[in-house]
């Protein structure tokens, strides 16, 4: 079946295109063209002058719709995924906070079942813990944090083909070996919940830690010890040009001014936007976080003792609005940081992330307030308030 989207401002890799068409055939993009003549037999969609952009790739998200991926059940996974898809997420990496091995194994089984389904939005599993620095635990369960142990992580990796990313603090004993092993297995090791200094960050980068989890959160910046000043993890990451970062762009985890600074230094190709959302995101009624220590206050998730932020209640469309409306980032770049850049970081840019011939038919229509009006995921409409 052919679908032709016309009369929109289309975001292509070369920039904005007006008076063109995005043509979908089944689950693929057949063509993006500057011709808007109606195709005989195609389902014609009038974008009404709105923005036609690639679907968002959520590379760090813990839940939504009242359910958490840490539950590990198929029902929880499906509910959370569907909740985020309504707001522009067309591909997703379900994320687990620090967990026990049985919890990881349960989530792996569920993730692999869903990935095997036709046109699945699930691209793989992301483990945020549990090889973290306990001094930077944040909202992670402290009793589950430990040093990397090859007797534990090797069997997990060997039995988890869905595992695409695993975070760790590079300064912890055994972390460099862990990062090198993950990189060799095609799993992205990412720096997270860390007190790493420059030497630690550089050693991690050389071992395969090429990405940084929720940049600025749960890591130190510039600081002083007695009368002397030292760089923190943040400055160390800025000094490594090829290291990519992700930022929670809800306008709360990172101030808009810092969001803009990160964009100016790292650039659109090395900076992704994430929600780091918990179960309460896109949820109805009085939904609660999976972790009983978490409360919702001031539009964000916090530990009940207010010692740390615990995650967001954001969806992908909010990331775009925050970047544009609060951080003064051009819309095209804000969208790219939710689509093209995550695809590049996770190694799926050959089939995701941009509106180009042959890529998966993941398309959004955004109105002038940057609200989602229509979502196609693999060619199927999953949200529509446009027609």
Show the residue positions of the predicted features.
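Conserved, mostly hydrophobic/aromatic
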Residues: 127, 182, 212, 323, ...
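Alpha-helical scaffold segments that flank or form the walls of functional sites
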Residues: 50-52, 59, 69-121, 143-159, ...
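Active-site core of metal-dependent hydrolases
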Residues: 158-283
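His/Asp/Glu-enriched, well-ordered alpha-helical/loop segment
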Residues: 229-247, 263-275, 280-366
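A conserved glycine-rich beta-strand in the N-terminal activation segment of trypsin-fold
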Residues: 15-24
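Divalent metal-dependent hydrolysis catalytic cores, especially in the metallo-beta-lactamase
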Residues: 62, 78-107, 120-133, 160-171, ...
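Active-site gating loops and adjacent loop-to-helix segments of metal-dependent hydrolytic enzymes
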Residues: 82-93, 133-160, 203-244, 284-309, ...
């Amino acid at each position: 079946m052919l679908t032709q989207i016309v009369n929109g401002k289309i975001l292509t890799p070369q920039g904005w295109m007006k008076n063109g068409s995005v043509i979908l055939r089944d689950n693929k993009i057949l063509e993006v063209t500057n011709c808007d003549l109606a195709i005989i037999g195609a389902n014609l969609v009038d974008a009404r002058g709105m923005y036609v952009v690639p679907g968002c790739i959520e590379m760090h998200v813990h839940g939504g719709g009242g359910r958490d991926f840490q539950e590990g059940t198929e029902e929880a996974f499906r509910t959370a995924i569907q909740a985020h898809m309504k707001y522009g997420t067309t591909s997703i990496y379900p994320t687990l906070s620090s967990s026990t091995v049985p919890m990881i194994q349960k989530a792996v089984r569920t993730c692999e079942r869903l990935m095997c389904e036709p046109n699945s939005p699930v691209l793989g599993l992301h483990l945020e813990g549990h090889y973290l620095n306990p001094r930077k635990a944040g909202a992670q369960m402290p009793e589950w944090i430990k040093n990397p142990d090859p007797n534990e992580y090797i069997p997990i990796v060997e039995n988890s083909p869905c595992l695409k990313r695993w975070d760790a603090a590079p300064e912890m004993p055994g972390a460099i070996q862990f990062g090198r092993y993950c990189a060799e297995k095609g799993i992205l090791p990412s720096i997270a919940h860390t007190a790493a200094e420059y030497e630690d960050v550089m050693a991690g980068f050389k071992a395969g830690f090429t990405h940084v989890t929720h940049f600025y959160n749960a890591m130190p910046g510039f600081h002083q010890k007695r009368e002397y000043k030292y760089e923190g993890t943040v400055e160390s990451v800025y000094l490594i040009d090829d290291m990519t970062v992700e930022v929670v762009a809800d306008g709360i985890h990172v101030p808009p001014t810092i969001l803009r600074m990160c964009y100016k230094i790292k650039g659109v190709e090395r900076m992704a936007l994430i929600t780091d959302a918990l179960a309460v995101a896109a949820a109805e009624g009085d939904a609660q976080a999976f972790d009983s220590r978490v409360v919702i206050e001031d539009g964000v998730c916090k530990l009940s003792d207010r010692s740390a932020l615990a995650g967001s209640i954001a969806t992908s469309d909010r990331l775009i609005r925050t970047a544009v409306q609060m951080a003064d980032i051009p819309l095209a770049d804000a969208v790219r940081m939710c689509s093209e850049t995550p695809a590049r970081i996770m190694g799926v840019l050959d089939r995701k992330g941009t509106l180009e011939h042959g890529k998966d038919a993941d398309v959004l229509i955004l109105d002038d307030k940057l609200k989602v009006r229509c979502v196609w995921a693999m060619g199927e409409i999953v949200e529509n308030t446009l027609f």
